[in-house]
């Protein structure tokens, strides 16, 4: 008796319970399903894909009044700020001339100062002639242009660089200083010779002023030794 009570207390003698979904299904239907839930799912998927292949998911028909009414209520100005493809751009206008050109028509394209210039109806021969004319016109006046540029550069260098004028002034001042020092040296030498002459030759002072110029060359060497 005690052993049975313990088994029942541990819930070991009870039968396995059905799931809640099966209980509710039995209560509602009151009958058994002829196939399982997995078969039901596969059958539903098969019918869904058949319907998908036969008819499109969304079909826009102009005869459908509900879609037309919804389309009429949409304002295209509302989407221009968000969708740039709906807004009118200048690229379409700029490509009109290019689209109008025939595929066999040759064009001349010139890139100058960050701009593109297209000239239609110009063959390669005409383009070569234009290039030759431009090259010849530049070579004819190239020498004159170079001379003007060189003269202008020289003038600007002399004008902007004050070092040239300062160097010329410094050279002139140095030459003048050298001449002044040489003149002072010669003058002092002359005075020394005048003072030393009567003592060297024993001549009188009265005769000295008259014959000093005649005997200057003779006394020059002796005065040099005396200075040393």
From Swiss-Prot:
Its main location: nucleus. The gene is JAZ7. A motif (Jas) lies at residues 176-199. Residues 101-136 form the Tify domain. It comes from Solanum lycopersicum (Tomato). Belongs to the TIFY/JAZ family. Repressor of jasmonate responses. This is Protein JAZ7. SMART domains: TIFY. It comes from the Eukaryota. The lineage of its organism: Eukaryota, Viridiplantae, Streptophyta, Embryophyta, Tracheophyta. A motif (Nuclear localization signal) lies at residues 177-184.
């Amino acid at each position: 008796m005690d052993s049975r009570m313990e088994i029942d207390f541990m819930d070991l003698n009870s039968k396995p319970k059905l799931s809640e979904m099966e209980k509710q299904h039995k209560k509602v239907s009151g009958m058994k399903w002829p196939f399982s839930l997995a078969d039901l799912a596969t059958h539903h998927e098969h019918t869904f894909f058949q319907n998908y292949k036969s008819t499109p998911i969304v079909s826009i028909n102009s005869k459908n009044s509900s879609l037309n009414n919804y389309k009429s209520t949409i304002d295209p100005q509302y989407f221009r700020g968000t969708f740039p493809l709906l807004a009118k751009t200048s690229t379409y206008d700029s490509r009109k001339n290019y689209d109008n050109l025939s595929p066999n028509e040759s064009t001349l394209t010139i890139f100058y100062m960050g701009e593109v210039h297209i000239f239609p109806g110009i063959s390669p021969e005409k383009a070569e002639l234009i290039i030759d004319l431009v090259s010849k016109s530049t070579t004819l006046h190239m020498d004159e242009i170079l001379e003007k540029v060189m003269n202008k550069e020289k003038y600007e260098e002399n004008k902007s660089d004050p070092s040239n004028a300062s160097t010329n002034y410094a050279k002139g001042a140095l030459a003048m200083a050298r001449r002044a020092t040489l003149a002072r040296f010669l003058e002092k030498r002359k005075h020394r010779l005048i003072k030393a002459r009567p003592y060297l030759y024993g001549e009188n002072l009265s005769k000295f002023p008259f014959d000093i110029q005649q005997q200057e060359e003779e006394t020059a060497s002796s005065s040099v030794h005396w200075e040393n």
